[in-house]
Amino acid sequence: MAIQFRSLFPLALPGMLALLGWWWFFSRKKDRLSSNGKQVGTLKVGPAIEDRLPTEEACPGVLSVTPSVTQPPGKEEQRSMDRPLSDPPALPRTRQVRRRSESSGNLPSIVDTRLQAGQCSDENSKVVLSLMGDEAKSIPLGRPLFPKDLSFPYEAVEGCKQESALGRTPGRGWLSQCAASGENARETGGAEGTGDAVLGESVLEEGLLPQECVSEVEKSEFPILAPGGGGGEKVRSGPPQVDELLKKEEYIVGKLPSSFVGPVHSELVKDEGALVPQVKGSQDRSLARELDKDKTLPEKDQIEQTAFQIISQVILEATEEIRATTVGKTVAQVHPTPGTQPQGQEESCVPASQETSLGQEIPDPASTRTGATASPSAGAPPPKTYVSCLSSPLSGPTKDQKPKNSAHHISLAPCPPPVTPQRQSLDGASNPRGDDTFVTCTSNNSQSVLSVTSLGLCSDPVSTSRLEDSCTETISSSGDKAVTPPLPDSTEPFSNGVLKEELSDLGTEDGWTMDTEADHSGGSDGNSMDSVDSCCGLTKPDSPQTVQAGSNPKKVDLIIWEIEVPKHLVGRLIGKQGRYVSFLKQTSGAKIYISTLPYTQNIQICHIEGSQHHVDKALNLIGKKFKELNLTNIYAPPLPSLALPSLPMTSWLMLPDGITVEVIVVNQVNAGHLFVQQHTHPTFHALRSLDQQMYLCYSQPGIPTLPTPVEITVICAAPGADGAWWRAQVVASYEETNEVEIRYVDYGGYKRVKVDVLRQIRSDFVTLPFQGAEVLLDSVVPLSDDDHFSPEADAAMSEMTGNTALLAQVTSYSATGLPLIQLWSVVGDEVVLINRSLVERGLAQWVDSCYASL
């Protein structure tokens, strides 16, 4: 296909150019045939006065007359007229200055009047000024070259008078004032029909010659050739008051703004025989561009507003189409309300700097088209336009895809079926009809912007856990009063912003709610330790959307899986701009984010949350890319219940169920009651840094004490061993002795201390999860004749567990909620079960656990 295109393109392009050339040639020929009956004469001039004024040298030296003064052209003039426009003769000129007339809007009326009078000649008929004879010299441009009996049409005179008040270009001399007004009307008429304006010739742009200028013309001495004959008669008079008129002109021009005048560069070509003014096509196009730019400021603002509205509509229409295609639903389509807005409102959301006074009615084709589109006829179908009202053009999603706080009320509702938009006035905009919702957004500058949006909630089925992917709407009236439409009785209830029937696309596991989205939405930038080793409940309450819609989708238990990611693999796991994490979330359907630790940068946590199917799929994808990554779950599950006062479970680092982990015993209450730490957990390395910071902080005087009465379960800083300060929790209070019992949450153990020795703890010191896990030995109880373990049993337990790493596994939980564990010690190649060892030594007895095994 490409070879055929390359072979045909060189032939097609010349053919098209040739076809256009023939069409242009015959159309021009037809125009010349129709204009043969209308002849244009020229004014032949003789030698000019040699002493010219210095200020007149910068003015063009070509004059033109009105079509009403016509004479049969000579041979040389006929050849000049028959010459094609594409090859104009060279035009010797001095520096030519061209200006834009602010009263160009008056020209069409002049042209229409002249056309009705039958005085408008063809646009190709040009009046040329030929300098005949060997004694031809430059014409003094400061002098007009018209006879005294030359008549001007009244309409052209009036138009020229209006233009003369707007300004003149400095240095133009009398030529810009005394040129023929009829020629200006003729040339402008040609530009009106073809879109090009002829300005190459020296036509009348400024206005008619003032009365004193006419009197000076009558007194001037010029060799003027009669229109019919070849000779001429000379009229002598006294010298004119040229300097006075030039001063007047410069004074008027000096008062004009610089935007009214504009210099244009022209060519300087010298001809031997004759001076023939012609206008090139490039100059025509240049003038057309100048005339297009020559509009008032309100008109430009209107055009900018209309263009901004059209671009916004196109972009938002494409966005709505993509969303509608993704969700597989039909979005209700409505057209904008009529463009009649009260003062202080606009049709589009534009910055305040682009606003114009709405009290002014500016005729603009773009605004006319907008009005026609806004109120179509009843028979014609209205255009399908999607309009979104934004309080600011720069508003958009934040980096973490969370919606920004807004002053408007947010409501979620299912997408209604498409309705047929009807013509409606602005008065009824505040009262929506059918399923159409008219949204009024109020920006900071207190200007309401009215537009129409389609009522609906669209969600990405691939990312069901992202509330920010859903399309919510801001619904308010013109008085900024929130209006929440009642939810219709629909058989398609919502669950977390997703239709129930859409859950089948991802399987039945997608029905679980995601209330923890607000707690763990930080992604790779999250620094909250509460989301790293949290012990969240397995059952979550219904989301607000589910409660409103009254739906009860199938509940699926959440699986939380956390893996350690070394520092050198974190960047690859996140991907460039988070692309790989987004790919994992969209492909697996699970919620995945990376959590950083506050006191260490060597290891970070990858949190995976979702149904079993989603978690397995995510782990499979991660394992394929990172074969060296350990996918063991280090997440600590929650405890069923705790009889003892405790902190929220998001702050504790507990042992995982059914998984053997390495631990060290940091405190021993008795032979069967221990506190252990997971020294291989990534958060354990930050404990040493935390101890140093707390020591430096609480060694200084002036730290406030705990308020009295002391609240149970409060976290505080308490003195530890060897002058250290440790984190502790109050578990009991004794008001009669002003003492409390505390439990060290990191190093374990209970202690009874005075209240005044405790200190309030800083919030950043409780960020790290509590490292001490309180456990009980499983299947081991004291001897039958003792209520407590003997000192020998305690000593034997300390000997077997002291200063060594052990292996622990949670098998069940006690009635108080403490985990029951099996504890092993590794001696060389031999693994010893400490629970059994106590029994074999006669220090305890073995009993089958009365609790159900995990």
Curated annotation (Swiss-Prot):
Residues 62-115, 333-437, 473-495, 509-551 are annotated as: Disordered. One of its GO terms (cellular component) is cytoplasm. Residues 558-622 form the KH domain. It comes from Rattus norvegicus. Binds to type I and II regulatory subunits of protein kinase A and anchors them to the cytoplasmic face of the mitochondrial outer membrane. Involved in mitochondrial-mediated antiviral innate immunity. Promotes translocation of NDUFS1 into mitochondria to regulate mitochondrial membrane respiratory chain NADH dehydrogenase (Complex I) activity. GO terms for molecular function: beta-tubulin binding; microtubule binding; molecular adaptor activity; protein kinase A regulatory subunit binding; protein kinase binding; protein phosphatase binding; RNA binding. PROSITE patterns: KH_TYPE_1 (PS50084), TUDOR (PS50304). GO terms for biological process: antiviral innate immune response; apoptotic process; cellular response to cAMP; cellular response to peptide hormone stimulus; negative regulation of cell growth involved in cardiac muscle cell development; negative regulation of dephosphorylation; negative regulation of protein import into nucleus; positive regulation of meiotic cell cycle process involved in oocyte maturation. Residues 338-359, 542-551 have a biased composition (Polar residues). Keywords: Membrane, Mitochondrion, Mitochondrion outer membrane, Phosphoprotein, RNA-binding, Transit peptide, Transmembrane. Interacts with SLC8A3. Interacts with CFAP91. Interacts with CLPB. Interacts with NDUFS1. This is A-kinase anchor protein 1, mitochondrial.
